[in-house]
């Protein structure tokens, strides 16, 4: 939640978000928002009967919130405004270098809400030029967090607005180089070895 607060303060437009196990608060929050999603607070997988199952971002029907009071009150749940997007954007900050990539998640049914729903090789990835104002805010975010590397997730809404979703200070990035040919590893080597 801290990273969402910082992103909001810096004008990176994170979606409205609440983490709660209070059913009444969840209901009130979701009543005010057109489309709501939920996602894991921690590990994106869960184990049941020895099998690993992914828990990706999922859009909720409002009735699910209204009808599941007991489940919501058992443990904290993240509820977030769902942003209808043109595509996802993975931003890799490596030292002073910023790389951004469009991930065309809207082209497959299994990745519409979360690009992790489809193996990266099946999704179109293209380099993306961020506006200078967004890059400047990302640099301020990195300074505030004391980071020299990050893999950030954004979406570009259908209205043309960039929305910060999360910061992964140890996030994956090599697949982006393998798919697009953009030499991120050169920047990583410069960062590590000068």
What are these regions (language model features)?
Residues 31-128:
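Phosphate-binding site of ATP-dependent enzymes
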Residues 16-21, 60:
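Short acidic-hydrophobic, aromatic-tinged amphipathic segments that line or gate anion-handling sites
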Residues 1-14, 25-28:
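Conserved N-proximal alpha/beta basic substrate-recognition cap immediately N-terminal to
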Residues 16, 77-78, 149-152:
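A short linear hydrophobic-aromatic micro-motif
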Residues 37, 151, 164:
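Generic enzyme active-site microenvironment
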Residues 125-136, 140-147, 156-194:
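C-terminal active-site "lid" helix and adjoining low-complexity regulatory extension at the edge
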């Amino acid at each position: 939640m801290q990273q969402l607060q910082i992103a909001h303060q810096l004008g990176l437009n994170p979606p409205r978000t609440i983490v709660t196990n209070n059913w009444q608060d969840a209901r009130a929050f979701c009543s005010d928002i057109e489309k709501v999603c939920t996602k894991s607070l921690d590990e994106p997988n869960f184990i049941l009967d020895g099998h690993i199952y992914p828990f990706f971002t999922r859009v909720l029907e409002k009735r699910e919130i209204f009808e599941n009071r007991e489940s919501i009150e058992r443990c904290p749940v993240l509820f977030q405004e769902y942003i209808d997007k043109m595509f996802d954007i993975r931003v890799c900050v490596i030292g002073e270098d910023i790389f951004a990539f469009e991930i065309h998640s809207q082209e497959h049914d299994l990745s519409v809400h979360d690009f992790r729903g489809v193996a990266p090789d099946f999704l179109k990835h293209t380099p993306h030029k961020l506006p200078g104002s967004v890059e400047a805010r990302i640099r301020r975010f990195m300074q505030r967090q004391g980071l020299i590397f990050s893999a950030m997730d954004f979406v570009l809404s259908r209205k043309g607005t960039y929305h910060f979703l999360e910061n992964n200070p140890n996030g994956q990035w090599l697949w982006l180089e393998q798919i697009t040919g953009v030499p991120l590893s050169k920047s990583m080597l410069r960062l590590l070895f000068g």
